[in-house]
Curated annotation (Swiss-Prot):
Family matches, as HAMAP family: Pro_tRNA_synth_type3
GO aspect biological process, one term: prolyl-tRNA aminoacylation
Compartments, record wording: Cytoplasm
Chemical reaction(s) catalysed: tRNA(Pro) + L-proline + ATP = L-prolyl-tRNA(Pro) + AMP + diphosphate
Function: Catalyzes the attachment of proline to tRNA(Pro) in a two-step reaction: proline is first activated by ATP to form Pro-AMP and then transferred to the acceptor end of tRNA(Pro).
Main subcellular location of this protein, as a coarse class: cytoplasm
Alphabetized InterPro entries for the sequence: aa-tRNA-synt_IIb (IPR002314), aa-tRNA-synth_II (IPR006195), aa-tRNA-synth_II/BPL/LPL (IPR045864), Anticodon-bd (IPR004154), Anticodon-bd_dom_sf (IPR036621), Pro-tRNA-ligase_IIa (IPR002316), Pro-tRNA-ligase_IIa_arc-type (IPR004499), Pro-tRNA_ligase_II_C (IPR016061)
Enzyme class at the top of the EC tree: ligase
Name of this chain's protein: Proline--tRNA ligase
GO cellular component labels: aminoacyl-tRNA synthetase multienzyme complex; cytoplasm
Pfam families noted in UniProt: HGTP_anticodon, ProRS-C_1, tRNA-synt_2b
Family to which the UniProt record says this protein belongs: Belongs to the class-II aminoacyl-tRNA synthetase family. ProS type 3 subfamily.
Gene of this entry: proS
């Protein structure tokens, strides 16, 4: 193996050393670098990772706009007095808030919070914009960064002090309208993972003790990582009337009676990139589904000097046809790099589909297509290359989804008591479902020894334990069970 091949290769094991493997993939695939010395918790997002984020952003933004959402932008800084108007926000985020206290050499009259979330700066403006029931529903979203000064170890795209996300905020005339909004956004988040990123997810709600500060209900999509930990992959909050009361969002109804609005907020961050990388990638490097890959297909011509001209001409024609069809294609016709090096490099970078073209393909009017996830090689006719490539994109997506779905299906296990929960989590990881009384105190006997928690409870319609007279008792305290709890370690 050459020095270049050694430099390209992934040396850590995904199954035995997941954290180090993940960090190596992120850096060697050119996705991110760590921030400057003295700024732990910050990363530099490199163009290839940002391109994936842009694809995700475009997919989700289109769904938002199709359902009545308009984009806006609000200040990065939030006056302390604004935060204090919603006490639950203050209590929930205060340990993580970064404050600006000086501008130039002058001390500010009021501290400014660097945006940890924007309810406190957006809601006052919604209050100004809403006067009548005719102004409702009102829906705004912003794509931005937020800062939360967490002390945990930096893990690119999973745990950083600054991260990219979108946050949507809406106001509605009724409780039912706000709940429908909450579920619409949750379904759209699930679609991002399942339809774009080829990742099955679980949908449910957070237990009351873990819901968003000030929320009536927090709904969540949870994704399972290969190390058996869960990722909170997106949340949608039914805020009830707490924020509307704090910030005076009122409207006159059809009878000219003054009413308090019902609000929601919902957000998805670049944690989705971390979950994507960790779920599909392998010990050859990054693996991406075609929908978000910066380069969807790479064409690699393979020639000897006496066949170079005809092979390159054939390969250029294939690449041009794909490019004209809107497929993101790269023609790798570099001199000085042998085909094996090119194959390894594009595998490391996660290109979903490779087309190999040598003298035999030219002579026979064919193409050799290789799938990134499993290395499957298929010979196809040159004619109709665009439709052929699109079909293979579908196959690559299906392979990725099927593998992830099989992993998730096999990682949900049942338990009836504390010892069983701890033993199953310790041996297998993943999700352990157990009957739960609804008391936060019954999470502690699992959290303390195992660092696991209740990451989700199913919605009432999906949970047999939400019905009366089921006869189940809590796995921890033996009181009557009210819900099914999903216990897991989490990022």
């Amino acid at each position: 193996m050459s020095d270049d091949d050694q430099e390209l290769g992934i040396t850590e094991s995904k199954s035995h050393n997941t954290g180090e493997w993940y960090a190596e993939v992120v850096q060697k695939a050119g996705l991110a670098d760590y921030g400057p010395e003295g700024m732990s918790g910050f990363i530099v997002t490199r163009p290839r990772a940002y391109a994936v984020w842009e694809r995700l952003q475009g997919f989700l933004d289109a769904k938002f706009k199709d359902t009545g959402v308009q984009n806006a932008y609000f200040p990065l800084f939030i006056p302390e007095s604004y935060l204090e108007r919603e006490k639950d926000i203050v209590e929930g985020f205060d340990p993580e808030v970064a404050w600006v206290t000086e501008a130039g050499n002058k001390e500010l009259e009021e501290r400014l919070a660097v945006r940890p979330t924007s309810e406190s700066i957006i809601t006052p403006y919604i209050s100004q914009w809403v006067r009548s029931h005719r102004d409702l529903p009102l829906r705004v979203n912003q794509w931005c960064s937020v800062v939360r000064w967490e002390a945990t170890e930096t893990k690119p795209f999973f745990r950083t002090k600054e991260f990219l996300w979108q946050e949507g905020h809406t106001a509605h005339a009724t409780h039912e309208g706000a709940w429908e909004e909450t579920m619409t956004r949750l379904d759209q988040y699930a679609s991002v993972y399942e339809d774009l990123l080829a990742m099955p997810v679980l949908k449910g709600q957070k237990p009351d003790h873990d819901k968003f500060p000030g929320a009536e209900t927090t709904t969540t999509v949870e994704a399972l990582m290969p190390d058996g930990k869960s990722v909170q992959a997106g949340t949608s909050h039914h805020l009830g009337q707490s924020f509307a009361e704090a910030f005076d969002i009122t409207f006159s109804d059809e009878d000219e009676e003054e009413r308090i609005a019902h609000t929601t907020s919902w957000g998805l961050s670049w944690r989705a990139l971390g979950a994507l990388i960790m779920t599909h990638s392998d010990e050859q490097g990054l693996v991406l589904p075609p929908g978000v890959a910066p380069e969807q297909v790479v064409v690699v011509p393979i020639w000897q000097e006496d066949t170079k001209d005809e092979v390159l001409e054939y390969a250029e024609g294939v690449a041009d046809d794909l490019d004209d069809a809107g497929i993101r294609v790269e023609l790798d016709d570099r001199d000085g790099r042998n085909p094996g090096f090119k194959f390894n490099e594009h595998e490391l970078n996660g290109v979903p589909l490779r087309i190999e073209i040598g003298p035999h393909e030219v002579e026979d009017g064919e193409l050799t297509l290789v799938h990134r996830p499993d290395g499957e090689s298929v010979v196809e006719d040159r004619e109709g290359v665009v439709a052929t490539v699109q079909d293979h994109f579908d196959e690559v997506y299906a392979k990725l989804y099927a593998t992830a779905e099989e992993t998730l299906d096999g990682a949900v296990r049942e338990a009836d008591d504390r010892a069983d929960i701890l033993g199953t989590l310790g041996q297998h990881g993943g999700y352990v479902t157990a009957p739960w009384c609804g008391d936060e105190a019954c999470e502690e006997p699992i959290k303390e020894p195992m660092a696991a928690e209740i990451v989700m409870v199913p919605f009432e319609d999906d949970d047999p334990l939400a019905e009366a007279d089921h006869g189940e008792t809590c796995a921890i305290c033996d009181d009557d069970a009210e819900r099914t709890a999903y216990f897991a370690k989490s990022y």
